[in-house]
C-alpha cells in the first residue's frame, strides 16, 4: 500500500505549474469517439482516472495513441456499442459519460453503473431523465444501464437540480440528435463550457454553455479536431490553500484566474494577500489567518471540491469557522482524520463548526476520498513533525505528480510503500 510521509512545519515557497483539468478531460475523451475521424487532445493530466478511461475506450474499439504524457490521438471509427463492464470502469464515476457519447454515435449504450469516490449518494437520475426526454429507452439491469433509441430527437429539458454530469452527458447526446434541444437549469462550470467548445470544434452547434440556458442544434456527423484542455482550477486551488495553511508564498502558473474567483475571495477574506496575473495567481500568507463562513454552491459559487482544503486551513485560523456543504452528503469524513491531529471540529448534519487551534499535531491519517486526501496532505505540511497519509490511491486519481510538485515549492514529502522506507525517511529528515 502506497502512503505519503510528510515532515511539515515549513512554509511552501515558489512556483508550481498547474496541469489540465481532470473534470474536463474525462468527458472530452469520451466525446472524442463520437466522430470516425482522428482527434488530437493535449494538456491532458497524467492521472489514474484518465488512464482508466483510455483503457475503457480501447476496450470498445477506439484506437488510442499516446503521443506523450499529456497528448493523445483517438480514432473512434472502430467503436462498437459493446457492453462496458464494471471491471473496466469501477474506479471512476465519469464512466457515465460513455452513455451520452455512445447514444449519440451508436444509438445504444450498455454501461456498468459508475464507481469513484464515496462522498454521498450522487444519483444519476437527471442524466436518465434527459436521455429519456431525447427519446431513449432506459433500463437498469444487473448493475448496468442499458440505453437504446432508433433516433434521438431534440426537445426541451428542465433539470430538477443543477448537475454538472447531467448537463454534460445530455449535451453530448443532444449534439447528434435530430432537431433542436434546449437545456434549462444547467451547470455553468468551466468544464461544461470546455466540453461544449470541444464538441463545437468537431462541428457541433452548441450555444449558451456557461449561461442559464444551453441551445443545441443537432448535427448528423462530427469531424476531426485538435483541442487543448483548460487548466485545472481545483488543482490550482489546492496549491493556493497549501500556501495559506503553511504561511507560504506560492505562485500557481498556467491558470485562468476567472475560474478561481470564489477561491480567491475566501483566501482574501481569511487574510491572505492574493495577486492575479494574466495566467497566474500568487498567494502570500504572512501571519495567522482568521476565521470565516463558507457554503459550497454550484459555479460560480464556492466549489465543493475545494471544501476540504479550506476546512484544513480554517482548523489553523483564529476564531470559529462554519462550513455548510450543500452539494454532497458525507463530505466531512476528513474531519474525523483532522481531529486525530488535534483539530477541534463538530459536525451537525451538513454543517461543520471548526474552532481554530494554534497548531496541529502529527499523526497517521487516512484519505477518505480524492480532495480530502489532498487536504490531509496540506494539514501534514502545516504541522511540525512527521505525518503519514494512507490510501493515497484516491489522491493519485486526480493529482498529477502531487508529491513532486509539493517538493518543488519546499514541501518535504515522499511516497513510501513499506515500514522500512518510513524509517529511512525519518532518519533522513531527523
Name the predicted role of every residue range.
Residues 1-430:
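Short, structured segments at the rim of ligand-binding sites
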Amino acid at each position: 500500500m502506497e502512503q505519503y510521509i510528510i515532515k511539515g512545519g515549513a512554509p511552501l515557497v515558489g512556483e508550481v505549474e498547474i496541469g489540465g483539468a481532470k473534470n474536463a478531460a474525462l468527458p472530452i475523451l469520451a466525446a472524442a469517439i463520437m466522430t470516425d475521424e482522428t482527434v488530437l487532445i493535449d494538456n491532458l493530466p497524467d492521472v489514474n482516472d484518465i488512464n482508466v478511461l483510455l483503457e475503457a475506450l480501447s476496450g470498445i474499439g477506439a484506437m488510442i495513441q499516446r503521443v506523450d504524457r499529456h497528448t493523445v490521438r483517438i480514432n473512434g471509427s472502430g467503436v462498437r456499442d459493446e457492453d462496458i463492464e464494471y471491471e473496466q470502469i469501477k474506479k471512476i464515476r465519469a464512466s457515465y459519460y460513455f452513455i451520452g457519447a455512445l447514444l449519440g454515435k451508436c444509438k445504444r449504450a450498455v454501461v456498468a453503473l459508475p464507481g469513484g469516490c464515496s462522498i454521498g449518494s450522487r444519483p444519476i437520475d437527471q442524466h436518465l431523465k434527459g436521455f429519456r426526454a431525447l427519446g431513449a429507452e432506459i433500463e437498469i439491469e444487473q448493475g448496468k444501464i442499458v440505453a437504446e433509441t432508433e433516433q434521438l430527437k431534440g426537445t426541451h429539458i428542465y433539470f430538477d437540480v443543477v448537475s454538472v454530469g447531467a448537463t454534460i452527458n445530455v449535451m453530448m447526446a443532444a449534439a447528434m440528435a435530430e432537431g433542436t434541444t434546449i437545456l434549462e437549469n444547467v451547470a455553468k462550470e468551466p468544464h461544461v463550457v470546455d466540453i461544449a467548445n470541444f464538441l463545437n470544434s468537431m462541428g457541433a452547434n452548441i450555444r449558451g454553455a456557461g449561461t442559464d440556458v444551453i441551445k443545441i442544434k443537432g448535427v448528423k456527423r462530427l469531424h476531426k479536431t485538435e483541442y487543448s484542455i483548460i487548466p485545472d482550477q481545483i488543482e490550482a486551488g489546492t496549491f493556493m490553500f497549501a500556501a495559506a495553511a503553511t504561511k507560504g508564498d506560492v505562485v500557481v502558473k498556467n491558470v485562468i484566474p476567472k475560474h478561481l474567483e470564489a477561491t480567491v475571495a475566501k483566501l482574501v477574506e481569511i487574510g491572505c494577500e492574493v495577486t492575479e496575473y494574466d495566467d497566474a495567481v500568487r498567494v502570500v500568507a504572512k501571519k495567522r489567518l482568521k476565521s470565516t463562513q463558507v457554503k459550497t454552491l454550484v459555479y460560480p459559487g464556492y466549489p465543493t471540491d475545494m471544501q476540504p482544503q479550506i476546512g484544513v486551513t480554517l482548523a489553523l485560523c483564529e476564531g470559529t469557522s462554519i462550513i455548510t456543504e450543500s452539494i454532497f452528503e458525507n463530505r466531512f469524513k476528513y474531519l474525523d482524520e483532522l481531529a486525530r491531529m488535534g483539530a477541534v471540529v463538530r459536525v451537525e448534519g451538513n454543517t461543520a463548526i471548526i474552532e481554530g487551534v494554534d497548531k496541529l499535531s502529527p499523526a497517521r491519517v487516512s484519505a477518505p476520498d480524492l480532495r480530502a486526501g489532498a487536504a490531509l496532505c496540506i494539514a501534514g505540511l502545516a504541522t511540525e513533525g512527521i505525518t503519514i497519509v494512507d490510501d493515497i490511491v484516491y489522491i493519485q486519481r486526480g493529482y498529477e505528480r502531487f508529491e513532486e510538485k509539493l517538493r518543488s515549492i519546499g514541501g518535504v514529502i515522499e511516497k513510501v510503500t513499506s515500514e522500512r522506507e518510513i524509517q529511512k525517511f525519518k532518519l533522513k529528515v531527523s
